[in-house]
């Protein structure tokens, strides 16, 4: 048995298996999903000491990292569709990363997996660091045997292996000794045969006389001389019987020690099997709990994740989409309510005392008082600009069709009715996109149609009542009563952010007869403009009209007309193509919720702004 096969376990257990070198550090530029506003941004990423950190750029590493995660329990997931993207998740924290190309992504994944495998959680290196021998005998406490060696926890098997090493040395020496003995015996036998042949050939030449005259052979003495060295103690002083007894005892000791080692290993195996069974059961329960947790987590969705927002490959279903939108709208409503309560204290409630109320005679429908300039002076019907024909067509269409009563039309559904306000909807879809026309009718006391339309059209007061706009600006002023406006709406996650580019025109349509009402109308419809190209937002298309008619109830006697005597009949029509990939059920539910809120909020704002002021007919 060669020495290089020694079972000596006195050295470190880590030497039983060659450990690989430390994992290679890595750094470079990766695109990281920051948030739903800025999207993917290049970041300097560093992989070092089982930690993944990122910086805004390579030049800003000295200012400290923007974030880091430990890879010990990280889960690395290559994206199913994007060949350059991979996600790293630790508990509920997720990093979304994109490489330059698939090969670049694979190199990063391999490096991260290498660091993770060396982290000490279930890796081969962690098993080596714990030590194979100690692990095998860690449960041997209390083992009872007839051997005189120590059977304390962590030492029994090691000491038995040391005993077997000693037995091996003894056995090797005994084998060498016995081999020498057998070799000597073989040599002696060979020499004996030669001597016997020689004696038989020459025995006649060596006769001796006996006193009685007989001749005898002298070979007895020579034979004694020949075989004197083959006695048990005659070859190199070796005690064959003693060596045989010792050899038998040594082999018996080896067998006993080996049997004891096997018993220890069997006991360890039983112990580890029980622990394995417990771990398997524990793992089963943990996996079941993990699946349940993941199911619950998916219901809540990862806020801001690129896979959990509106898009063709969105992982969020319609129910979860609606829940998320509704929750975001509720939060926004609370913020708007608190802001509106603060803003109301700053709204002027009355005009200076030098201004007087406008008066008019008793009539059923409003006519401008003589002291007021004619409406055509305020809003001309003969604007000259490049969209003039489109504006005229829109106004005529709305005056023809939008004022028609749809209450008895089976194609229109009454979706909301609150007091004087009624909201109708006609379901229309085109290529999977919801294009439902909505029509609302409302009656508001204390305001005129001119006042309502003026506040709806005037961009100077837009932010006072419009709470869904993030920012807007006038792209071009076509005429005193026609402008092109670009506005970006606040994003409601997980829906994509949307913008609108539209022409807004205000117009008064005089009454055709004395018994009819003058009508004020604001038309907003989508147009294109070079100064507002498409961007990261989803461009929505709109065709909206606010149509208002003023009714006046005659005051008693010769009293002046007050706001108690006026009432505004409002017809609001909206045709919106939202674009994008939002589910139809979500769009309809949001429209049903938001349109009535908008009308109530806007009309209340006009009432508060005009209260105590002169009437604008």
Swiss-Prot record:
Compartments it resides in: Cytoplasm; Golgi apparatus; Endoplasmic reticulum
Keyword Endoplasmic reticulum: yes
Annotated positions binding an N-acylsphing-4-enine: 466, 487, 524, 572
Pfam families to which the protein is assigned, alphabetical: PH, START
Segments carrying motif FFAT: 320-326
UniProt entry keywords in alphabetical sequence: Coiled coil, Cytoplasm, Endoplasmic reticulum, Golgi apparatus, Lipid transport, Transport
Biased composition (Polar residues): 1-11
Keyword Cytoplasm among record annotations: yes
Domains as described in the record: The START domain recognizes ceramide and mediates the intermembrane transfer of ceramide. The PH domain targets the Golgi apparatus.
PANTHER family: CERAMIDE TRANSFER PROTEIN, PHOSPHATIDYLCHOLINE TRANSFER PROTEIN
Protein name: Ceramide transfer protein
Species: Xenopus tropicalis (Western clawed frog)
Gene: cert1
């Amino acid at each position: 048995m060669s020495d290089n096969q020694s079972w000596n376990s006195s050295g470190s257990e880590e030497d039983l298996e060659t450990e690989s070198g430390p994992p290679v550090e890595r750094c470079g530029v990766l695109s990281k999903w920051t948030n739903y506003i800025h999207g993917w941004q290049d970041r300097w990423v560093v992989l070092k000491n089982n930690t993944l950190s990122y910086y805004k750029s390579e030049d800003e590493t000295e200012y400290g990292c923007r974030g880091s995660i430990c890879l010990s329990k990280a889960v690395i997931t290559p994206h199913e569709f994007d060949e350059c993207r991979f996600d790293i998740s630790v508990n509920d924290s997720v990093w979304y990363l994109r490489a330059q190309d698939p090969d670049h992504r694979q190199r990063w994944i391999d490096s991260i997996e290498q660091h993770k495998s060396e982290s000490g959680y279930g890796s081969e290196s962690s098993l080596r660091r714990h030590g194979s021998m100690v692990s095998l005998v860690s449960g041997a406490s209390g083992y009872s045997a007839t051997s005189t060696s120590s059977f304390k926890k962590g030492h029994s098997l090691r000491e038995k292996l040391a005993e077997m090493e000693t037995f091996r040395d003894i056995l090797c020496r005994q084998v060498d000794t016995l081999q020498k003995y057998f070799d000597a015996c073989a040599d002696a036998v060979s020499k004996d045969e030669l001597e016997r042949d020689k004696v038989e050939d020459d025995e006649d030449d060596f006769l001796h006389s006996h006193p009685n005259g007989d001749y005898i052979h002298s070979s007895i003495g020579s034979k004694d001389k020949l075989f004197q060295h083959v006695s048990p103690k005659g070859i190199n002083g070796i005690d064959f019987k003693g060596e045989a007894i010792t050899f038998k005892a040594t082999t018996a000791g080896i067998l006993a020690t080996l049997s004891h080692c096997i018993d220890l290993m069997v006991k360890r195996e039983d112990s580890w099997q029980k622990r394995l069974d417990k771990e398997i059961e524990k793992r089963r329960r943990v996996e079941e709990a993990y699946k349940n947790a993941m199911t619950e987590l998916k219901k809540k969705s990862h806020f801001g994740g690129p896979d959990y927002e509106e898009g063709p490959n969105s992982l969020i279903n319609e129910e979860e989409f609606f829940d998320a939108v509704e929750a975001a709208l509720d939060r926004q409503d609370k913020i708007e309510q608190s802001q509106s309560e603060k803003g109301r204290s700053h709204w002027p409630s009355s005009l200076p005392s030098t201004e007087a109320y406008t008066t008019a005679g008793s009539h059923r429908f409003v006519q401008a008082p003589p002291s007021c300039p004619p409406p055509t002076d305020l809003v001309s019907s003969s604007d000259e600009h490049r969209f003039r024909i489109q504006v005229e067509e829109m106004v005529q269409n709305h005056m023809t069709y939008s004022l028609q009563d749809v209450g008895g039309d089976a194609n229109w559904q009454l979706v909301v009715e609150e007091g004087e306000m009624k909201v109708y909807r006609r379901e229309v879809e085109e290529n999977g996109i919801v294009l439902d026309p909505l029509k609302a009718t409302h009656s508001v006391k204390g305001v005129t149609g001119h006042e309502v339309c003026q506040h709806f059209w005037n961009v100077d007061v837009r932010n006072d009542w419009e709470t869904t706009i993030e920012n807007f600006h006038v792209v071009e002023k076509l005429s005193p009563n026609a402008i092109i406006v670009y506005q970006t709406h606040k994003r409601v996650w997980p829906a994509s952010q949307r913008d609108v580019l539209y022409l807004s025109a205000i117009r008064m349509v005089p009454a055709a007869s004395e018994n009819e009402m003058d009508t004020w109308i604001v038309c907003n419809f989508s147009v294109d403009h070079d100064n507002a190209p498409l961007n990261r937002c989803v461009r929505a298309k709109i065709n909206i009209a606010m149509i208002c008619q003023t009714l006046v109830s005659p005051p008693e006697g010769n009293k002046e007309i007050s706001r108690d005597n006026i009432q505004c009949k409002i017809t609001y029509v909206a045709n919106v193509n939202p674009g994008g990939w939002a589910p139809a059920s979500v769009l309809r539910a949001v429209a049903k919720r938001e349109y009535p809120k908008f009308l109530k909020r806007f009309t209340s704002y006009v009432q508060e702004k005009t209260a105590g002021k002169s009437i604008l007919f």
